[in-house]
Amino acid sequence: MKFLIVFCGLVGLSACFPSVFDEPDVLTDKMVEFINGQKTTWTAGHNFEYIPQERRYVHVKRLCGSLPQKHSPVKLEQKEVVVDMDLPDNFDSRVQWPMCPSLKELRDQSECGSCWAFGAVEAMTDRICISSKGAEKFHISAEDLLSCCSSCGMGCNGGYPSAAWSYFKRSGLVTGGQYNTHQGCRPYTLPHCDHHTTGQYMPCTGDLPTPKCSKTCEDGYNKTYSADKHYGVSVYSVSSDEQQIMAEIYKNGPVEAAFTVYSDFPSYKSGVYQHKSGSELGGHAIKILGWGVEDSTPYWLVANSWNADWGDKGFFKILRGQDECGIESEVVAGLPKL
């Protein structure tokens, strides 16, 4: 311990302090104060306060359900995007395609490691609307993908984004909105919960099991399960090249990506995130819907699935062009069959 104190004094607190964080400390005032004391591009704040301190670490790890692509049973062919246009410095899919309301929506994965499914169906939903020029505005069901794709992984215990897109092309997915919306064939059956603050939902109290695969639509829906299926015509991985990812979004809409979550990320509130401190919590899948530059720092604009109470109203920005936390290494997408 004496050596650690002396060493910190020699090399500076900012270089040594991250190593002394224990797992129970990662979502505390200590972490927030440390991040905000750095000269960095983002601001930390108090998230997950409604979760008891002794459960926060385990709760956030549970939400990180994207399994490493190297272990995936599905390897998608990489698509080379022809960058035949001048890409703008700033791009936001919500502005580019205002006729598609799903681009502005934030879903809630609840207490389930289903981020891999949410990142996929969110991008699929957006791309169907974009490809149809706003004619098709339904939601692809996270419930259907989570519960019925046996090759995708382990449901609420994690899955593979690449396998999710492969399933979309091979088996198709039905429609389904968020919990208690009664939208579509199979809405999400896991309830919203307050991960972060005392708010409008019930508190998150414990892990939830993967829903059972049901190949019937909820009562009152006007189609059969098989008639409600929607398919991808092509699915692929996208090069980790920054320009390739930008061109893919610019041409076809949001993509799904996965990155490594470290224990400082859950405290994000604003700015352009880059990892500063803490241990690895797991992989997390999200939807990238644009990019830009903030105070000379390039970023990706990302929609999370931890409801709108987290971060910057549910969204966040992360450093672009440096493969920050692996965000540019596992990008997948596809085109819908209309």
Locations of the language-model features?
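Catalytic-core signature of thiol
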Residues: 2-8, 12-338
